[in-house]
Amino acid sequence: MRVLYFKHSFFRSLLKSNGLPQTLLVFLLIPCYLTVDFRAPPLIPDVPFLWAWNAPTESCFTRFNQPLDLGLFSLVGSPRKSATGQPVTIFYSDRLGLYPYIDDSQLIFNGGLPQLVSLKSHLEVAKTDILHYMPIDNVGLAVIDWEEWRPTWARNWKPKDIYRNKSIELVQQQNILLNFTEAVKWAKEEFEEAARHFMEETLRLGKSLRPNHLWGFYLFPDCYNNKFQVADYKGECPDIEKHRNDALFWIWEESTALYPSIYLKSSLKSSPQAALYVRNRVQEAIRVSKVKDPRNPLPIFVYFRIVFTDLTYQYLYEDDLVNTIGETIALGTSGMVMWGTLSLSQTMKSCLDLHDYLKTILNPYIINVTLAAKMCSQTLCQNQGVCSRKDWNSNDYLHLNPQNFQIHFVKHGKYEIRGNPTLENLLYFSQKFRCSCFAHLNCQERADIESVSTVSVCTLEDICINSLVISDKSELPKDWNRPYFVNSNQSDITSSATVSPCVPRKDVSGYLVVLSLYSQHLKYSL
């Protein structure tokens, strides 16, 4: 058995009468505030925050007989080209229709430009591809990942400026009397119109064939807030990029989900800039999600990675998880999609490393933030919405308080929660967060936090907090956080010990270990 103890330094550092139905009378007696902010309803009932796994890690089991604990993820799919019928389906440029592009060696595919491809032929091939990769219309995510060119002319800067240059050449060939300025204007109009029709009609086709899937484009919206070298970097999305996103209203109107990305480079490791970078990108997605209908916004599923984009064998730990996952949940999105490459599962060692990372780092943090978010939602929203920051640009996070909660890793690869919520915990939620109501629900935010007497929330694997709310942590049993063992032959490492997040595999099963995960800037304080 193993105890995962998230110390305060990590999350600050862990984490029918009178003719009326009785339920209505009870509801009317609960003091509430009207909520004016909305979020998309859950894709899966009773799963307000959805975790999806989209990495080719099945070979850990099929090749190396090393299963991975992905039980916390509602949707698990592989991005391999051979994989079909996945709950998360990602369409790359070679998997959906006749996507026009020019590769790095300047080879031209399908005309190279959206102006030159036959839309009719593209849709015919795309229909076949959709039916192949989605043989059944189950509930799931449909993500189109086309990154060779951008539908906004101005965003095709180097090296994507080849699409602007080729478009200008095309206009000049067709209209030899035009001067360069006129050719650029015509080329821009033709390119953007063709790109719009190409992307719009693809979305419409997907929705018509597989309406139970949520369709959208990966990396949309983006806000290009990656100039980390600028002094006093604040992560803000440039106004010009917000205006350009506004001009892409046609994408937001046809999409049924948004899929922004918050991948980190190693230069942002344990950096406050990472939180600012992620926060502003997610907030821009929230803004865009309301373009079509502020009272019925699009769901937002944020793509993230558990490794750095430039160091694919270095996992995200401690601060980095708070700066990515913690930020995303605190802003009130619909879920996250973990994407990865073959590097996660190429060898037996990489599979063992991934197994240990899941068990000791990622899964405990997912449990932490999931239960904290659900507890806040139950307290403030009566489970009819999600909690989101009152000040979106603050450092307020949804973490379990380490002073009265512990996450234990027990026998048979299971986790359990020890401790009780305190009134102070619930008041923190009320002070720092608001209820963002699910669309189509008459949701109100609860005001009488002091009257909440119980909390009952669970993750997917029935890891639960089912307990009374205590007035103070002093009411906890004296031995509530006492380490205990799988058998009498096992010894323990004292709870004040700190060990590396990268726990050796020999320590993953066996005697109790207390993980004290530290952070300089965390992010739960009462």
UniProtKB/Swiss-Prot annotation:
Tissue distribution of the protein: Expressed in testis, epididymal sperm and epididymides (at protein level). Expressed at highest levels in testis with lesser amounts in epididymal sperm.
GO terms under cellular component: acrosomal membrane; acrosomal vesicle; external side of plasma membrane; extracellular region; plasma membrane
Pfam family, one: Glyco_hydro_56
Record-level GO BP terms: carbohydrate metabolic process; fusion of sperm to egg plasma membrane involved in single fertilization; penetration of zona pellucida
Signal peptide: 1-35
Disulfide bond annotation, renumbered to this chain: 60-351, 223-237, 376-387, 381-435, 437-443
Catalytic residues identified in the record: 147
Residues linked to a glycan: 165, 179
Role description: Catalyzes the hydrolysis of hyaluronan into smaller oligosaccharide fragments. Does not appear to be essential for fertilization.
Protein name: Hyaluronidase-5
Organism phylogeny: Eukaryota, Metazoa, Chordata, Craniata, Vertebrata
